[in-house]
Amino acid sequence: MVRIVKLKIRHLTRYRYASPLRAAVQTLCLTPSSGAGQQVHHWCLDVSGRLQPHTDAWGNRSHLMHIEAGERELRCEASGVVETCGQAWSPEPAGPDPRVYLAPSPLAVLDAAMRHDLRDAGLEAPRDEDLALALARHVAERVRYRAGTTHAGTTAAQAWQGGEGVCQDQAHAFVAACRGLGVPARYVSGYFHAPGSESLASHAWAEICPDPAARRWLGIDITHVGRVDERHVRLAVGPDYAACSPIRGVRSGGGRERLTVELEIVALPA
């Protein structure tokens, strides 16, 4: 049975700087698109700089945020309502050829140790849902979820060797494994509705395209070892986190920075 959920989301990010900025440019991948599995009812960005919208190479709705000289705070609030229905398979007739996601990317490279581990475990290329979930289960066991053990630049191989990481690391390891087994895979950034959770954060999972000619993608949440469902809101996709992180950029000046993030996700009455 299809379950439809309407989620109200508010995501506030603040950077505070010890001294005035000379200049800063940020790329924001904070605008979800309507498509298979989700419908955006309304969405807005409230930021401290000037926004320049564009569509990036991976088909994401993105914005460049330009900050003027003299600012000591960078503020970005994304908010809106998205209706989800838990559709795990997403047709994508347009966009890049799925086979571009067979190429390794800096944060999702399958090294020799990972390759040997997958071979010893007898894991097959994830050509269907059952095989994809078996691989996700193995990755979740090899890279146990533990906050604070990795950072934004941790690679799949490093997380695999360390045996711990967060959703980002588990997604990178899964993506690297799929590519190594010959199946196009990409990283997904978004939100996960977890009622009752005291510490919400943005989430990451993966999508695979078992048959590139069909151009259908299957969403797999490695952290929760399951298909994506109505709890997931998809923001952006790319080869890895570096290509589609919610906020990334460069700055000149500012000195030390302090980052604070607030995230609220509430299910609205039907």
Predicted region positions:
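Linear, non-domain "peripheral" regions
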Residues: M1-R119
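Intrinsically disordered, low-complexity coil segments
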Residues: R3, G122-R127, D211-R216
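Structural beta-strand/beta-sheet cores of well-ordered domains, especially the beta-sheet scaffolds
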Residues: V5, H11, Q26, A78, ...
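Ser/Thr-centric signal marking residues that sit
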Residues: T13, T150, T223
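Hydrophobic/aromatic-rich core segments of domains that either
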Residues: A24, R137, D169-G255
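Generic structural hydrophobic/aromatic packing signal, biased to beta-strands
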Residues: L28-L30, L45-V47, A78, L118, ...
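A short, structured loop/turn motif at beta-sheet edges
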Residues: G70-E73, D128, L181, D211-A213
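Secondary-structure boundary elements
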Residues: V82-T84, P91-G165, A173, Y241, ...
